[in-house]
Amino acid sequence: MTNNQTIVLDNKVAFIQGGSRGIGAAIAKRLARHGAAVAFSYVSSDERAAQVVKDIEAAGGHALAIKADSADAAAIKAAIDKTVATFGRLDILVNNAGVLAIAPLADFSLEDFDRTLAINVRSVFVASQEAARYMTEGGRIINIGSTNADRVPFAGGGPYAMSKSALVGLTKGLARDLGPRGITINNVQPGPVDTDMNPANGDFAESLKAIMPLGRYGKDEEIAGFVAYLVSPEAGYITGASLSIDGGFSA
C-alpha cells in the first residue's frame, strides 16, 4: 500500500477518542510516528494513558492525554476544544472509543443498551460535529466500526452490531455534509483483532479463527497502518466508505 516515508503528517494535529489501549494506542503512536501531534481521550487508567504519551514523546513526538468519558457529550466537546487550545488546530479525528456488551436477549439491560448507543454512536456524532467546527480543507475523520455490522456469528451481540451498523449510515450522511468543505470521513471495520479486550486465544477466539480465510486475528498495528493511509493526502478521494480489514471474516 504505502510505507512510512510516503505518509507525511507533519504539522497535522489529531484527536483520538479512546487512545490509551489496543487499537487506539496503536493509532496514536502510528500517527505520531508520521509527524502528527496527537491528543487522545481515555476513561480509566491514568498510568496506561501516561505510558502512551511517554512512548510518543520518547520517539520525538508530541502527545496529550485527556481524561474524558465518551458517554459524556460535554466531556468529549471539551477534550476536542482542549486539543485545539493546546496545539492550535485540528486536522484529524479518529473515533475509536467503543464498548462491547454481550448478553442473551432476555438478560440484556436497558442500561447496557443505552450506554452502547451513547459511546458507539452518539459520541461519534458529537465528536464529528465538534471537530468539523475546526477543520479546514484536507480534514480527515475516521470512525472505527466493526465487521459485525455485516456479520454476527455469535449470539448476544445484536445491540453491538446495531451500533456499528449505524456508523455505516452516519459515515455516508456526513460525507455529504463535509465533502463540499474538502473534509473526508470514512468508516474502518476491523475484524477480530488481538487486544487485551479481545485476546486471540481461548475457545471463543478459536471459533472465530475457524471461519476466517487467514485463520488468525489481526494486529492492532495493521489497523493503525490502514488508518494512517486513510488520513494521509494520498487518500483524498476516499470518503463515505466503510472499509473492512478483517482477514476475510466477512467473506
What residue spans do the PLM features occupy?
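Conserved glycine-rich cofactor-binding loop
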Residues: 13, 20-21
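Alpha-helical segment proximal to the catalytic Tyr-Lys
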Residues: 133, 176-180, 236
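Conserved glycine-rich Rossmann-like NAD(P)H-binding loop of the short-chain dehydrogenase/reductase
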Residues: 34-51
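Short C-terminal tail/terminal secondary-structure segment
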Residues: 2-5, 151, 228, 239-251
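A conserved structural motif in NAD(P)-dependent oxidoreductases
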Residues: 212-223, 234
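Active-site helix of classical SDR
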Residues: 128, 163, 171
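Substrate-binding pocket helix/loop in short-chain dehydrogenase/reductase
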Residues: 104-105, 112-114, 208
